[in-house]
């Protein structure tokens, strides 16, 4: 059975710009399916049409060029909408927010907040990544979720996946070059605050998972097979399968998925009532499932078409 905490990590990869981990492959064989669609939807009201693209926040360079239908939808749009505009926040500002949301107060540390056995395993894993010990001293002042993010980011980079090639960043930079207006649903402070609001138990489980289950190339390939082929069914399985069996995680999903989807749909409806075409780029996990953005818009009577 897939570890449920891995599925939380997977969701964060495809639904938060500040992401952490990836779920193991399901038994679904995405390689044997034949899909001709992209992870892009055209959504129409009586007066306007917009486009909604599911993003993955880290990728390999060879993901580009993207499907022509995606680029054409971008070209037709006057305004780009992302979860957060990560091109509009400096590294210094992000660093200050990270210290505010993820750093322990003076006199406290990761070592004093987790078991000695877990800290020993964390230290061993981090020293594998950085034998100088600098990274370990840095990590020790941060909460478990920050350390989990750091470890998994190294996993991504070692496999050749980087936020530099993330789909959201690609379109934000493109919009800046083309002089298109950029809007954001959330802020970096809001997203970091969601991580920080996770219980100690969930944060520690995320940290254990980052140590015990390093991201693999096969996992990432399965994810991108689903994305490249527009396989929304497999993406939904990767995000949601088995969650209903664990009420504690269902509550967490309600907070980090459903509540955010409802707020995004409210804003999307305002775009659909206007006369300007918007190109919305959000994590692919936001688009699938009963409370996914696409299904919510469909239930409200808007026409949704996967391209």
Region annotations inferred by a language model:
Residues 33, 63, 164, 257-261:
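A conditional alpha-helix N-cap/helix-loop micro-motif detector
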Residues 11-19:
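Bacterial N-terminal signal peptides
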Residues 23-25:
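Bacterial signal peptide processing site
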Residues 21, 130-133, 179, 275, ...:
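Glycine-centered loop/turn motif at secondary-structure junctions
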Residues 250-307:
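A cross-kingdom marker for long, charged
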């Amino acid at each position: 059975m897939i570890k449920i905490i891995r599925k939380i990590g997977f969701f964060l990869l495809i639904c938060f710009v500040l992401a952490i981990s990836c779920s193991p492959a399901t038994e679904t064989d995405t390689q044997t399916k034949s899909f001709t669609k992209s992870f892009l939807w055209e959504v129409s009201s009586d007066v306007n049409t917009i486009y909604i693209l599911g993003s993955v926040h880290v990728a390999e360079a060879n993901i580009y060029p993207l499907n022509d239908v995606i680029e054409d939808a971008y070209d037709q749009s006057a305004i780009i909408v992302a979860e957060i505009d990560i091109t509009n926040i400096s590294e210094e500002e992000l660093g200050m927010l990270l210290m505010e949301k993820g750093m322990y107060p003076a006199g406290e540390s990761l070592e004093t907040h987790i078991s000695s056995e877990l800290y020993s395993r964390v230290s061993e894993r981090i020293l594998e990544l950085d034998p100088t010990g600098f990274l370990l001293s840095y990590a020790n002042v941060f909460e478990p979720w920050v350390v989990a993010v750091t470890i998994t980011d190294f996993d991504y980079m070692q496999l050749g996946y980087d936020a530099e090639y993330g789909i959201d960043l690609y379109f934000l930079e493109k919009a800046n070059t083309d002089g298109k207006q950029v809007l954001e649903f959330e802020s970096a402070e809001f997203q970091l605050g969601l991580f920080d609001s996770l219980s100690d138990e969930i944060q520690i489980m995320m940290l254990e998972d980052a140590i015990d289950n390093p991201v693999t190339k096969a996992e990432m390939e399965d994810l991108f097979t689903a994305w490249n082929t527009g396989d929304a069914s497999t993406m939904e399985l990767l995000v949601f399968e088995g969650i209903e069996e664990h009420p504690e995680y269902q509550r967490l999903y309600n907070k980090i998925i459903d509540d955010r989807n409802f707020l995004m749909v409210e804003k999307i409806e305002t775009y659909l009532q206007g006369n300007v075409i918007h190109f919305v780029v959000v994590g692919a996990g936001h688009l699938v499932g009963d409370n996914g953005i696409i299904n919510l818009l469909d239930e409200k009577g808007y026409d949704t078409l996967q391209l």
